[in-house]
């Protein structure tokens, strides 16, 4: 990302702050008549010289390995899912709010405030089911995608593996593999292997 920057700074300060910036043109300007700016300032006009990726410590995309690119794409997909459900939740909440506001009864002058306005049971029930279902689905999706993004989970297999690892199932499985086998179990296993080997 390269942009054009033209600004006023005191002489020598920009070279100390950003030594990697290539200055294409340096002009001396004596601003003696300006009450806001001090005299003897340097006008730096930089074209194709300021790189934000270097400023923020990002590497050149050509130098990044394939694994890092795949990891970045994976995290970007998780983030996109979370923010997509967040926007959907916000939209559904605004729709539900507008639906509730529309049903509000505001009496005019010389009207009773205890008289129920005309309404339809079918329409109210349908709108209530729609609003509650949309809010429940989008909020659940936002919460689940946020948790999956936090724990870096992108598939069902990864979820089952990390859940098994968190509950201690992986360690128990390794302990069971280290235990010596029973003689009867070993005989049954050998007979099954021999039967399958003959066929």
From Swiss-Prot:
GO cellular component, one term: mitochondrion
InterPro entries hit by this protein: AIM11 (IPR038814)
Assigned keywords, A-Z: Membrane, Transmembrane, Transmembrane helix
Annotated localization: Membrane
Membrane topology: Multi-pass membrane protein
The keyword Transmembrane helix appears for this protein: yes
Keyword Hydrolase: no
Membrane spanning stretches: 79-101, 129-151
Family the UniProt entry places it in: Belongs to the AIM11 family.
PANTHER family to which the protein is assigned, alphabetical: ALTERED INHERITANCE OF MITOCHONDRIA PROTEIN 11
Protein name as catalogued: Altered inheritance of mitochondria protein 11
Protein species of origin: Komagataella phaffii (strain GS115 / ATCC 20864)
């Amino acid at each position: 990302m390269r942009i054009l920057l033209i600004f006023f700074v005191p002489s020598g300060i920009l070279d100390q702050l950003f030594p990697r910036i290539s200055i294409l043109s340096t002009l001396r300007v004596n601003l003696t008549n300006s009450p806001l700016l001090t005299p003897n300032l340097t006008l730096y006009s930089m074209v194709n010289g300021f790189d934000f990726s270097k400023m923020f410590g990002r590497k050149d995309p050509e130098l990044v390995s394939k694994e890092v690119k795949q990891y970045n794409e994976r995290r970007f997909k998780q983030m996109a899912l979370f923010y997509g459900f967040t926007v959907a939740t916000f939209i559904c909440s605004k729709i539900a709010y507008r639906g509730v506001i529309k049903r509000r009864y505001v009496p005019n002058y010389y009207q009773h405030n205890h008289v129920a306005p005309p309404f339809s049971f079918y329409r109210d029930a349908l709108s209530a089911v729609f609003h509650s279902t949309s809010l429940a689905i989008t909020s659940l999706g936002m919460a689940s995608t946020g948790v999956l993004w936090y724990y870096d989970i992108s598939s069902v297999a990864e979820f089952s593996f990390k859940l098994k690892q968190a509950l201690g199932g992986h360690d128990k499985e390794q302990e069971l593999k280290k235990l010596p086998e029973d003689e009867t179990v070993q005989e049954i296993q050998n007979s099954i292997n021999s039967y399958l080997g003959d066929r």
